[in-house]
């Protein structure tokens, strides 16, 4: 949807990369420095959760509308404006509706952008959430995969043996 909408609104070179990011590059050819503006298109909700939009007193309500659908819509409008007005810029602008930001996505979309643009990136501005503030620093994420194997498990058949769930719970509380 995002790619088709961008193309219908003047951003003919919009594309989807291998990480499922929707990208529109403006004056970003060759090795020019770029500023990346992004908002994420994934949500924490599984596909089985209905995302029903309702309106009350002039406000929209829907799971994920604040994280991050509203920002995606604004970013798409900004990209369309730039595509049509063609402002003069000192470097490239990259508009990204990035994927795999939430949950198990492990920032796959952001990491793909870093791999694609690398040292050309002068700044990254991510529109995320709906709070009344600005975070002016990089935000990091560390992910760990922990495997715990024990002899115990079932509360009846393995009674008295160490239980993996209990051990994981102890790690979390520490």
Model-derived features: positions:
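Acidic/His- and Gly-rich active-site-bordering loop/insert found
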Residues: 1-61, 81-84
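Buried hydrophobic positions in well-ordered alpha/beta secondary-structure cores of metabolic enzymes
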Residues: 6, 24, 37-40, 75, ...
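Short, glycine/charged-enriched secondary-structure capping and boundary segments
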Residues: 29-30, 50-53, 108-112, 138-141, ...
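Histidine-centered active-site/metal-ligand motif
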Residues: 40, 154-156
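Acidic-glycine-rich active-site phosphate/pyrophosphate-binding loop
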Residues: 42-55, 121, 136-147
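Acidic/histidine-rich catalytic neighborhood of metal-dependent amide-processing enzymes
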Residues: 60, 64-143
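Acidic-enriched catalytic cores of C-N bond-cleaving enzymes acting on peptides and small amides
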Residues: 156-174
């Amino acid at each position: 949807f995002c790619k088709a909408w961008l193309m219908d609104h003047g951003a003919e070179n919009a594309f989807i990369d291998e990480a499922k990011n929707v990208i529109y590059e403006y004056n970003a050819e060759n090795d020019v420095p770029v500023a990346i503006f992004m908002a994420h298109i994934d949500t924490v909700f599984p596909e089985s959760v209905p995302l029903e939009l309702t309106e009350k007193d002039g406000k929209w309500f829907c799971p994920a509308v604040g994280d991050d659908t509203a920002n995606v819509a604004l970013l798409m409008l900004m990209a369309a404006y730039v595509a049509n007005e063609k402002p003069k810029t000192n470097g490239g602008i990259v508009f990204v509706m990035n994927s795999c930001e939430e949950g198990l996505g492990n920032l796959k979309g952001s990491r793909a952008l870093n791999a694609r643009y690398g040292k050309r990136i002068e700044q990254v501005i991510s529109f995320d959430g709906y709070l009344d503030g600005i975070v002016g620093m990089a935000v990091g994420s560390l992910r760990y995969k922990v495997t715990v194997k024990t002899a115990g498990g079932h509360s009846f058949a393995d009674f008295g043996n160490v239980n993996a769930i209990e051990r994981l719970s102890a790690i979390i509380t520490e």
